[in-house]
């Protein structure tokens, strides 16, 4: 069975929910404390054993490429001033093996994944969506979310969808799966999927939340997938077809997931990540407590 070595991160969207800041700044570069959102995603991929990353880019996304590139002038300035700690931070993002391709038309997530076909070269691969940041608590023995999916792939093969249960009022915001429970309550063999169903039409409350291991068979299916909900090529529609010909698993991963594509979710992530920081947590908590009096 092929090892999962490559990952794709779709990052071509306009980020309209965060206008006006996203008019000139990629949504993926908005910082959670002092680190761009997309860096958290890339770091999860690397911590999960991924060796090569393809970012599906788009118009006005050059800042992403610059962030993961070397910065000779800045590095020289930091080196001359003896700021070795900051120099190390700047250089660590430049050493990551990142590739880029443009999605020329915004035709949905399925079309964005299809842009990665030649890069994947017939191999199974990972997908990480930039709107989903997952905090894995190492003190509780939690592995990165993508690593958990790779472990399921290594054990069962096929494709693996990263899922969690969502509250009823959120069902219509996600792709929802149905299936037969396997090996305990955290793993299902998928029999059906519906993209953003009404609650009355949802087969469960188990939602796909931005992490995937996908068989290369998906590319042929995407090439023949007609635009679906919203007039876009839906990855969910192709995965539903994939489940008819190959095993597709839904795994409820451990970790706290933040919807950073939503303003409130982004604020929650910023606050909680700041509170976990050894250098910021104490003073910031004191500030919040004083603020809430």
Named regions from a protein language model:
Residues 126, 134, 138-146, 150-154, ...:
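Catalytic-core segments of class I nucleotidyltransferases/pyrophosphorylases
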Residues 2-80, 98, 140, 144:
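N-terminal glycine-rich phosphate-binding loop and ensuing alpha1 helix
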Residues 12, 58, 130, 164, ...:
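Cofactor-binding loop segments of dinucleotide-utilizing enzymes, especially the Rossmann-like FAD-
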Residues 74-77, 84-179, 223:
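Conserved beta-loop-beta/alpha segment of the NTase-like Rossmann-fold superfamily
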Residues 29, 98-100, 159, 248-250, ...:
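Conserved beta-strand scaffold positions in the cores of enzyme catalytic domains, especially
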Residues 6, 51-53, 97, 124, ...:
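Residues at the starts of beta-strands that form the adenosine-phosphate
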Residues 37-40, 111-115, 238:
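Well-ordered alpha-helical segments embedded in enzymatic catalytic cores
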Residues 9, 55, 127, 161-162, ...:
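Structural beta-sheet core signal
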